[in-house]
Amino acid sequence: MIGIDITSTDRIKKMYEKFGDKFYEKFLNPDEIELIKKPETAAGFWAAKEAASKAIGTGIGGSCSFHDIKIKKDALGAPKIKYKKEIRKKFGIKKSHLTITHDAGFAIAVVVNVLKKK
């Protein structure tokens, strides 16, 4: 399954300016917040989590929340994504891949989930 999302960096920046850390806490865990050094990164993480929820066919909501999805960076700074165990099991996810790009004030993320054979 594939999910994609595009997010305005300016929108994320304005939300942070208005609500501060409370805004980040709505969609990021403490480890993810530590990785945020600029609005572009936060926008990329937002887009990544939205794309991940779309890749399981639900969107963000009752079946999958922002906090059911975790983003890390590898040694080279590339983003990595992981769903909570309950989500992986419920949707039969074997492995997940994430890419994030930024251009013209937008963050775009694509998530590809490899599913377990039935």
Swiss-Prot record:
Which keywords does UniProt give here?
A: Cytoplasm, Fatty acid biosynthesis, Fatty acid metabolism, Lipid biosynthesis, Lipid metabolism, Magnesium, Metal-binding, Transferase
Q: What is the catalytic activity of this protein?
A: apo-[ACP] + CoA = holo-[ACP] + adenosine 3',5'-bisphosphate + H(+)
Phylogenetic placement of the source organism: Bacteria, Pseudomonadati, Campylobacterota, Epsilonproteobacteria, Campylobacterales
Chain sites annotated for binding Mg(2+):
5, 50
User: For this UniProt entry, what is the primary localization, expressed as one broad class?
Assistant: cytoplasm
Q: What's this protein's function?
A: Transfers the 4'-phosphopantetheine moiety from coenzyme A to a Ser of acyl-carrier-protein.
Q: Which organism is it from?
A: Aliarcobacter butzleri (strain RM4018)
| EC number(s) from the headed UniProt entry | 2.7.8.7
Q: Which domain of life is it from?
A: Bacteria
CC annotations in GO: cytoplasm
Its gene name is acpS
Q: Name one GO biological process term.
A: fatty acid biosynthetic process
Q: What Gene3D superfamilies does this protein map onto?
A: 4'-phosphopantetheinyl transferase domain
- From the Swiss-Prot or TrEMBL record, give the protein name: Holo-[acyl-carrier-protein] synthase
Q: Where in the cell is it found?
A: Cytoplasm
| Recorded family membership | Belongs to the P-Pant transferase superfamily. AcpS family.
State the InterPro entries in the record.
4-PPantetheinyl_Trfase_dom, 4-PPantetheinyl_Trfase_dom_sf, ACPS, Ppantetheine-prot_Trfase_dom
